Amino acid sequence: MKWYFILILTIVLSCNEKELKTASVAFYNLENLFDTEPDSSSINEPFTPEGEKKWDQVGYTNKLKNLAKVIGELANGGAPTFLGVCEVENKKVLEDLIAQPSLKKENYAIVHIDSPDERGIDVGFIYKKSIFTVEHFTAHQPDLSYSKDLTRDILHVQGKVINGETLHFIINHWPSRGGGSEASESKRIAAATTLNNIKVSILKTEPNAKIIVMGDFNDEPSDKSIAEVLDVSCNQSNTAKGQFFNAFCDIEKAGKGSYLYRDSWDMLDQIMVSSTLLSDTNAIHFKNNSATIKSETWMLQTGKYEGYPLRTYGGNTYLNGYSDHLPVFILLQN
């Protein structure tokens, strides 16, 4: 009888271990996470020991340590379950990042594909191997052929969480506002069109797919690329089937943001979820009102630029900071 009791208890415990109660999804622009090695295939010369930044091993080590500190307590005081990143030079810098002492215990894994971006920076995806298994991933290059520019790929990652549900993650870093937001708008519209095509392709084969979109969009929730081209909803209760709900609309309306430019906050870093993550409350779904910008006093500058995110460099002056963007996150629950 005791043997049967132990067997039943073991089965129950094993099942409980495979239930995903809560998970955090975050995005962080890591601002020029370059190693110190010259790379002939990208324009990274400033981030070398001989370059204008005098970027050496000490600076690189400090950068990794600083970013790991933020990530380690990013989502409600802990490391996120899923983390999209941008402005990384290669897979090696992500491997160095997750190997930091404060992150090693998270047992993270990486998805990364080199992109043709002119600055030599890519997007990436970091996830906890104990929670998520990647099934496949693809990179999609926005069509900027009309301008002869090359930008970051949009990364689509598909996999299963431990309870068996399939999740899709799409990580973005859209073209910058260099030259002005209006002059560069067409490039972000091209990126939005590519993202919309990815969504349509997923839903064609999996109509009830659960999709999470994240990134530095270099546009805000109310801008044309997001509000019109992607047709993203800012009203959770009225999000139609096939639409994305932008969890950061209300934060933009409140005058807050993830990037401070000329003393004005811009909500450039966002996370959106498909309608299926709003309606299916008997499975993994978006936790209402969980959208958050991670901001701590120690992540911000003091003095002349008080309140600005504490970045690695101000021009060519080394500040030993974190990033010029603040990270964002949402919560999922089951």
What positions do the PLM features span?
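Extracytoplasmic, non-cytosolic globular domains
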Residues: 112, 155, 159-250
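Metal-dependent phosphoester-hydrolase catalytic domains
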Residues: 200-211, 219-334
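Extracytoplasmic/secreted cell-surface and envelope-processing proteins
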Residues: 36, 92-95, 119-122, 178-181, ...
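N-terminal, active-site-proximal structural segment of metallo-dependent hydrolase catalytic domains
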Residues: 15-101, 107, 111-115, 121-123, ...
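Bacterial Sec-dependent N-terminal signal peptides
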Residues: 1-21
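Second-shell loop/turn segments in exported
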Residues: 51-58, 79-85, 112-113, 143-145, ...
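Structured beta-strand-rich core segments of catalytic domains in phosphoester-bond hydrolases
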Residues: 88-174
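Active-site-proximal beta-strand/loop segments in catalytic clefts of secreted hydrolases
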Residues: 28-31, 86-89, 112-116, 128-129, ...
